[in-house]
Amino acid sequence: MKARLWQTLFLLNTLIISEVSFAEDANKDVRDLKEQNIMSVLYQQTAAERLASSLQTFSSAKRALDIALADPSWSALPGQNVKDKKTAIIVDIDETVLDNTAYEARMILDGTKYPQGWVSWGKEEAATEVPGAKDFLNYASSKGVTIFYITNRVVELKEATQINLTKLGIPWDKTKETILMRGENNWDSDKGSRRALVAQEYRVLLMAGDNLGDFVDAKYNNLSPQKRKAIVEEYADYWGEKWFMLQNIAYGDWEGALYDFNYSLSPDEVHNTRIESLEPIR
């Protein structure tokens, strides 16, 4: 009897140890994968070069805004009918206006992965300003231009986002719906329908974002890296004139494109795909 009892206890102990070991290995895989992002997040948070790039982008956008206001035929939306319309700009929020690199740093240090902790982070209302964003947006507002924020933050974060913007002195119109969130009105992550909604009443003078999908519809964004580059080249005349891209080397659809937008890959598969995507010249 004692022998059978000890045998049972031994088996249970082995199973528990195996399960704990498996969980620890899984957490280690996630941690190792996130640690590959350390240099990216450090660049976003500490590099003088990133600061210069961001200030440069918004300074260029400010000059472009003056040109756009002086030209009644100007539009940042290809083929838009601009007759008798009010003026507006469209900007993304995350990594365009609000800097969430503190959340990225947390994930690295805690060994977690998105979307773990994302909603909680948003509700802290602690994101900082992307350098140059506030100055540019206040300038646009002073010119009577309506600012539309088209973001893929979930609608649950709407109030927290509004508070975060207000804390930073970033303008948003409280008299109309100008912060358009994912999940509102059946909007999905494709921002095209929201841009089209704005275009019904407004002449869109320029757009700013950190992701190709902030400028083009999903069918042109959710492609291979090579095809996404071809789309960028197709709109070469828009960049720096009507469309303004902010640097974000920490995350984005540029990474999803490496995996063919298959987010069910294991950490090992993600790591291997990253390695295979490198292009050395020897």
Name these PLM-found stretches.
Residues 1-9:
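Bacterial N-terminal signal peptides that target proteins for export
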Residues 9-18:
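Bacterial N-terminal signal peptides
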Residues 22-91, 260-282:
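Non-catalytic pre-domain segments flanking phosphatase-related domains
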Residues 27-28, 158-282:
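C-terminal cap/substrate-recognition subdomain and adjoining C-terminal extension
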Residues 43-54, 119-126, 148-154, 183-184:
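Second-shell loop/turn segments in exported
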Residues 89-100:
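Asp-based phosphoryl-transfer active-site loop
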Residues 95, 133-166, 210-212:
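Substrate-recognition element of Asp-dependent hydrolases with the DxDx(T/V) motif
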Residues 104-129:
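Metal-dependent phosphoesterase signature
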